[in-house]
Amino acid sequence: MSENSIRLTQYSHGAGCGCKISPKVLETILHSEQAKFVDPNLLVGNETRDDAAVYDLGNGTSVISTTDFFMPIVDNPFDFGRIAATNAISDIFAMGGKPIMAIAILGWPINKLSPEIAREVTEGGRYACRQAGIALAGGHSIDAPEPIFGLAVTGIVPTERVKKNSTAQAGCKLFLTKPLGIGVLTTAEKKSLLKPEHQGLATEVMCRMNIAGASFANIEGVKAMTDVTGFGLLGHLSEMCQGAGVQARVDYEAIPKLPGVEEYIKLGAVPGGTERNFASYGHLMGEMPREVRDLLCDPQTSGGLLLAVMPEAENEVKTTAAEFGIELTAIGELVPARGGRAMVEIR
């Protein structure tokens, strides 16, 4: 079987970050008294559901450690590797850091798919690592019933510049660096609904590095940062709000969206992860049409950075973004928490 004839997505029950365990189930898994052990040098653990762990070396520098892997979201092996690696490396950028090394995680059904196809996946991962300026230094592989690929990535960051998802403040404006709709477009493609002019758009967005995060970290007015992945914009924004004790007002029309995404939602191209996200976070939302809900809960794979920015830093953030070819528009704001109001209001 050649790399050109296979459809990797046929060999997995999930796709990309959409195969994440739901937040509700994850809460049960992670609930443990032992998890309360605290190392004073561990600046960021799993208590705020940040993008990565951060360990203070005590010399002004901290180490960032993260891992991310998933099943195929596209059929092309090389692109699958690129997307999975780009998604994993993004966690380092979301913390404001610089990646320095990665190792691969590979699960492969060796009796179903040839090692040559696995090599193409790995080469895609290596290509993404080179784009980030790091080596794919090793890894671990197992014989698995479904193809899985990802990375464990190590990075560094000046301790004073670590960006968490829990340090946002009321008054911050919200910015998103990539358009929403990755889950919708990839689902539309699987259902043979995707128009020719939209072919490859989701892959292009997923392969785009969030390298700007390291530069955003240098801006004092960037108070919080996270990447939007499997829990959708609603999930990751809710976690930012919960961690900081604030609420959000979002302008739906200002949210960047992939072309055709609203049409595909109406045609039923909604991934299964969308409903799981709504089941976990829907109670935090105000009233809104079903189509709006489905986009805000759409699981993103290798999605954009969500930034909480003080108004006085807006111009500097936009200028920095432009240096990376990113055009930013505020999609909302954070406000003081008030009882009786939805955590995330859509206008």
From Swiss-Prot:
The lineage of its organism: Bacteria, Pseudomonadati, Pseudomonadota, Gammaproteobacteria, Enterobacterales. ATP binds at K20, T48, R49, D50, D68, D91, G139, H140, S141. One of its GO terms (cellular component) is cytoplasm. The record marks K20 as: Important for catalytic activity. This is Selenide, water dikinase. Its EC number is 2.7.9.3. One of its GO terms (molecular function) is selenide, water dikinase activity. HAMAP family: SelD.
